[in-house]
Amino acid sequence: MSETNERNRRHVYQGRVVSDKMDKTIVVVVDTYKNHPVYSKRIRYSKKYYAQDENNEAKVGDTVRIMETRPLSRKKRFRLVKIVKKSV
C-alpha cells in the first residue's frame, strides 16, 4: 500500500488553541455535536488534544487543523497541519 493512502486515513480535526505555554506543544479543543436520542437536542461535546507545533507559530485563540501521527510523547499523538484562522 502506498504511503499517501496510509496518510489519508489518519484522523484530521479542526479546533481552537487553548494553551501554547509548553515548548513546541499546543493544546487544541475540538467540539463535536450529537443529537440526544430522546429529546433530539444537539449536545456539544469537547475534547482536548495535545499537538506538536514545531515552530511555535500557533497562539491562543487560533483555529487550527491537526492530524494524527505516531506517538511523540506520553500524551501527544497529533501534529499541527495548518493554521486556518489567526486570532486577533
From Swiss-Prot:
Keywords: Ribonucleoprotein, Ribosomal protein, RNA-binding, rRNA-binding. GO terms for cellular component: cytosolic small ribosomal subunit. Gene3D superfamilies: Nucleic acid-binding proteins. GO terms for biological process: translation. The keyword rRNA-binding applies. InterPro entries: NA-bd_OB-fold, Ribosomal_uS17, Ribosomal_uS17_bact/chlr, Ribosomal_uS17_CS. It holds the Pfam family Ribosomal_S17. CDD domains: Ribosomal_uS17 (cd00364). GO terms for molecular function: rRNA binding; structural constituent of ribosome. Part of the 30S ribosomal subunit. Belongs to the universal ribosomal protein uS17 family. One of the primary rRNA binding proteins, it binds specifically to the 5'-end of 16S ribosomal RNA. This is Small ribosomal subunit protein uS17.
